[in-house]
Amino acid sequence: MSEIKLIVGLANPGAEYAQTRHNAGAWYVEELARICGVSLVPDSKYFGLTARAVLHGKDVRLLIPTTYMNLSGKAVGALANFFRITPEEILVAHDELDMPPGVAKFKLGGGHGGHNGLKDIIAKLANDKNFYRLRIGIGHPGDKNKVSGYVLGKAPAKEQELINAAVDEAVRSTEVLFKEDMVKAMTRLHSFKAE
């Protein structure tokens, strides 16, 4: 397995979106930055908030695109190209409708599952889908016509607690990833379910 050199948290920019379900990926990167003791700062060259962190002696770039979600690939492509980071060295954290709140899972490759942020990243990486994902469960509204309003809405307090617990566990599992390997990180994270 390649070492992860770039961790991306997907989000929509602006205060009105900060607490919406669609921004779960950004919550994870913000927490990772906090435990690494680094500040995410705006960088127009990479169309996002970026930081350089060190996790268990390994350098990693953190990125939260500040474009809208459906243009996330612009930021990821710009930073990956500049630092010559390959898709296999990228971990993208995003909200996942097909998993309940309180659960998060790592995954390598796959499609975009209708997620516009992932769709744009795949396009900007020359259709290479072979990057890692951290899927953060937000649950599903039960009707595909309600998805847009659902992801752009705030979770009720109990659901938010579950999502936050999964994000915290994902951060701890990321430390395992950098200290040991992806298999151990997956084993830890995939056995977790906040109640």
Swiss-Prot record:
It is an enzyme of class 3 (hydrolase). It is found in: Cytoplasm. InterPro entries: Pept_tRNA_hydro, Pept_tRNA_hydro_CS, Pept_tRNA_hydro_sf. Its EC number is 3.1.1.29. The keyword Hydrolase applies. One of its GO terms (molecular function) is peptidyl-tRNA hydrolase activity. The record marks D95 as: Stabilizes the basic form of H active site to accept a proton. TRNA binds at Y17, Y68, N70, N116. CDD domains: PTH (cd00462). Belongs to the PTH family. Hydrolyzes ribosome-free peptidyl-tRNAs (with 1 or more amino acids incorporated), which drop off the ribosome during protein synthesis, or as a result of ribosome stalling. This is Peptidyl-tRNA hydrolase. It comes from Shewanella sp. (strain MR-4). The lineage of its organism: Bacteria, Pseudomonadati, Pseudomonadota, Gammaproteobacteria, Alteromonadales. The gene is pth.
